[in-house]
């Protein structure tokens, strides 16, 4: 452990003493190297960002970042615990002391991973993307209310804890204060946003932009979450603008004229209809998500939704809770930016001339802060004049190019995500109390197990939609779709089998008609006697005797077959009349004619429906694809059995009635009722079912499910 610490300290210059151990590289921020380490004082893993102070520009950036992150306190913003100097020394609240150091360390909240690393595995589900987008907008609403522009929003700067699906905005190294009451035109740095997430206005006017540039970057990130790839990935700024114009309509004529003066080659007379609209770039998203994205990715920043307006869009209504979307109570103003620049200039002037004026009676804290500086000189951002452009600093993300054998993240979650509204650090020499304050303070109302958020959902939707269980919701929807497909397949196969039954019935009817025609021909006794006399008068040869014997045998077989068929039909007729006598005189004639004529058909249908029942039962046992399928199938069976409670005294009678509905019995009952044509039939089902039971075969009776039915409507409901 000590050797590893010494190696990292020698290579990267990390000098924090023995308090922080187990250092692991995470990547580079906007202006510094980031490591993770374990704080031995409280046994917590934290993220530590080192900022090297080499020139006035780096000092200014550090002053700006520290001032911003110390005041921002939100559930969707990475928390900052401490600002340390070399060897882990404590720094005072006076930011002017930074000018005396060569490096500074920002100890902040450790997050498990970032969105860029998550998207390397592929696109997200739309529910997950919507949840992360809501948290991003929630954080942006707070940041913009504090008059701060992030200016470097990209997936690598959005950190995620996968355990609770909390997203937080980090890396404010390129953020700056923008007071809306003052004009910053011409005094803003160029090209700070990563090229792929730059808005069209930022490409046209690099020194003139507003908070809308963060919203454009947020829209590009949302599209990237849905597709798994960058929405507009241009190789250079000209190609970037071309890709945007191919998909984003230019509605206003003044915007088209400005484009015509800059890149006339790519400008058409009608720019309202793009060649490749967002519907083609994002073919799989919902209509609500597409409408939401089209209102964010607008060419004109004046038409673009703000963070607050985006949270009020119907697409975000599932999570939106305005009372739990706070804004800054202490926003920045132009004075904060002016004071930092003046302090930096005065302090550096004091340092550079310290050897000449070492006997000066004024101490560092007694130096005057306010002078009569020209406002244009104050608003000028020296970052635009640096040798290394900010674009190059932002574009390179070393986190993605770390060696594979290095550990990037720690499995254990670092901290709870809640924090107090205003930090109150009573002991500046130690920050262990800040961890306790972090863990014991209020929690975000839209997080897991948050009662205000859940109460709001109950009040609004009358049911709780837990945002942290999207996978279960999707599994349920998939199960419903699979169940629907299975039911469609089962219905189709059953229809095909019913077609086979009808074919078999038609074949049996044809054979019966043929047999009846043969029986209808009868036996001509006179012809037989005449033939016999004629044969007896002739010489009886062996051939004639054989023919006579054949004729006698055929006649005897024909008579035997006729007797058997008559006995079978008479037996069925008597059996059917005896059973149907219980229906009463109202339905005697119609039921008798239908039942007697369909005696053999009833037996065939009963036997076939029994086989269908067995096949469907076996198919149902083999088609479970998930535990949800089996669980809900069992639940439906149990609910069906519990619909009719059985009393102790009537258990035997209802048990007998339950056996009446076999696979063939159900089909037979519905067919006979339809053929009779008596929709006004409302008598108890017990007696006709007992009569029909006698006509069912034993095999069909054995395979019938034991489900009690007491009314005709319940039978039809079960059949359907």
From Swiss-Prot:
Its EC number is 2.7.11.24. Its cofactor is Mg(2+). A motif (SEG motif) lies at residues 189-191. Heterodimer with ERK4/MAPK4. Interacts with (via FRIEDE motif) MAPKAPK5. Interacts with UBE3A; this interaction may be indirect and mediated by HERC2, possibly via HERC2 interaction with NEURL4. Residues 20-316 form the Protein kinase domain. GO terms for molecular function: ATP binding; MAP kinase activity; protein heterodimerization activity; protein kinase activity; protein kinase binding; protein serine kinase activity. There is a cross-link at residue 1 (Peptide (Met-Gly) (interchain with G-Cter in ubiquitin)). Belongs to the protein kinase superfamily. CMGC Ser/Thr protein kinase family. MAP kinase subfamily. Residues 638-657, 700-720 are annotated as: Disordered. Changing residue 334 to K: Abolishes binding to MAPKAPK5. The modification Phosphoserine is found at residues 189, 386, 554, 556, 683. It is found in: Cytoplasm; Nucleus. The gene is Mapk6. Signal peptide: none annotated. Residues 647-657 have a biased composition (Basic and acidic residues). Keywords: ATP-binding, Cell cycle, Cytoplasm, Kinase, Nucleotide-binding, Nucleus, Phosphoprotein, Serine/threonine-protein kinase, Transferase, Ubl conjugation. It catalyses: L-seryl-[protein] + ATP = O-phospho-L-seryl-[protein] + ADP + H(+); L-threonyl-[protein] + ATP = O-phospho-L-threonyl-[protein] + ADP + H(+). Changing residue 171 to A: Kinase defective mutant, abolishes activity. It comes from Mus musculus. Residues 700-714 have a biased composition (Polar residues). This is Mitogen-activated protein kinase 6.
């Amino acid at each position: 452990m000590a050797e590893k610490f010494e190696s990292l300290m020698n290579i990267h210059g990390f000098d924090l003493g023995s308090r922080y151990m187990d250092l692991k590289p995470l990547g580079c921020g906007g202006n510094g190297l980031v490591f993770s380490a374990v704080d031995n004082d409280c046994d917590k893993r934290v993220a530590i960002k080192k900022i090297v102070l080499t020139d006035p520009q780096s000092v200014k950036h550090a002053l700006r970042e520290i001032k911003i992150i110390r005041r921002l306190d939100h559930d969707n913003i990475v928390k900052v615990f401490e600002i340390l100097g070399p060897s882990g020394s404590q720094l005072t609240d006076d930011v002017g002391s930074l000018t005396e150091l060569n490096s500074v360390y920002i100890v902040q909240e450790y997050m498990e991973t970032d969105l860029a690393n998550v998207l390397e595995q592929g696109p997200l589900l739309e529910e997950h993307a919507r949840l992360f987008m809501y948290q991003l907008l929630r954080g942006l609403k707070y940041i913009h209310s504090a008059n701060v522009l992030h200016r470097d929003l990209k997936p690598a700067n959005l950190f995620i804890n996968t355990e609770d699906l909390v997203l937080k905005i980090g890396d404010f190294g390129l953020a700056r204060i923008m007071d809306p009451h003052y004009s910053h035109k011409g005094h803003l740095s160029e090209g700070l946003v990563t090229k792929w997430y730059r808005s069209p206005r930022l490409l046209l006017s690099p020194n003139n932009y507003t908070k809308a540039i963060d919203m454009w970057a947020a829209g590009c990130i949302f599209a990237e979450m849905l597709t798994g790839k960058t929405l507009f990935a241009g190789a250079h700024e000209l190609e970037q603008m071309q890709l945007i114009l191919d998909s984003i309509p230019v509605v206003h004529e003044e915007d088209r004229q400005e484009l015509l003066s800059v890149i006339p080659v790519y400008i058409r007379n009608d720019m309202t209809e793009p060649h490749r609209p967002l519907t083609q770039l994002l073919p799989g998203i919902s209509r609500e998500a597409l409408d939401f994205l089209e209102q964010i990715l607008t060419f004109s920043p004046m038409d673009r939704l703000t963070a607050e307006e985006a949270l009020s869009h119907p697409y975000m209504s599932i999570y939106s809770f305005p009372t739990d979307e706070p804004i800054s109570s202490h926003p920045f103003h132009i004075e904060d930016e002016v004071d930092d620049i003046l302090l930096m200039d005065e302090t550096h002037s004091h340092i550079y001339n310290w050897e000449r004026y070492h006997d000066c009676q004024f101490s560092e804290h007694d130096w005057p802060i306010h002078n009569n500086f020209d406002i244009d000189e104050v608003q000028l951002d020296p970052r635009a004049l640096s040798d290394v452009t900010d674009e190059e600093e932002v574009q390179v993300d070393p986190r993605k190019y770390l060696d594979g054998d290095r550990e990037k993240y720690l499995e254990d979650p670092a901290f709870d995500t809640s924090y107090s509204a205003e930090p109150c650090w009573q002991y500046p020499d130690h920050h262990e109390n800040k961890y306790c304050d972090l863990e014991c303070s209020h929690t975000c109302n839209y997080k897991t197990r948050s009662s205000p958020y859940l109460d709001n959902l109950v009040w609004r939707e009358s049911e709780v939609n837990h945002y942290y269980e999207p996978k279960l919701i999707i599994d349920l929807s998939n199960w419903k779709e699979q169940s629907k497909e299975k039911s469609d397949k089962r219905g189709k196969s059953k229809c095909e089998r019913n077609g086979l039954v009808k074919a078999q019935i038609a074949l049996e009817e044809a054979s019966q008609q043929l047999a009846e025609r043969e029986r209808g021909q009868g036996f001509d006794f006179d012809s037989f006697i005449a033939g016999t006399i004629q044969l007896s008068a002739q010489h009886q040869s062996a051939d004639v005797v054989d023919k006579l014997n054949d004729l006698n045998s055929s006649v005897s077989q024909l008579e035997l077959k006729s007797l058997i068929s008559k006995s079978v039909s008479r037996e069925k007729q008597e059996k059917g009349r005896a059973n149907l006598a219980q229906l009463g005189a109202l339905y005697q004639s119609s039921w008798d004619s239908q039942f007697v004529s369909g005696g053999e058909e009833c037996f065939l249908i009963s036997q076939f429906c029994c086989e269908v029942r067995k096949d469907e039962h076996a198919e149902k046992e083999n088609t479970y694809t998930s535990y949800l399928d089996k669980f809900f199938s069992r639940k439906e069976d149990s609910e069906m059995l519990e619909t009719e409670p059985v009393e102790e005294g009537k258990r035997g009678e209802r048990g007998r009635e339950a056996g009446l509905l076999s696979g063939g019995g159900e089909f037979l009952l519905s067919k006979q009722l339809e053929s009779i044509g008596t929709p006004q039939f409302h008598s108890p089902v017990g007696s006709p079912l007992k009569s029909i039971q006698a006509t069912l075969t034993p095999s069909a009776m054995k395979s019938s499910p034991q489900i009690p039915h007491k009314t005709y409507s319940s039978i039809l409901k079960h059949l359907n």
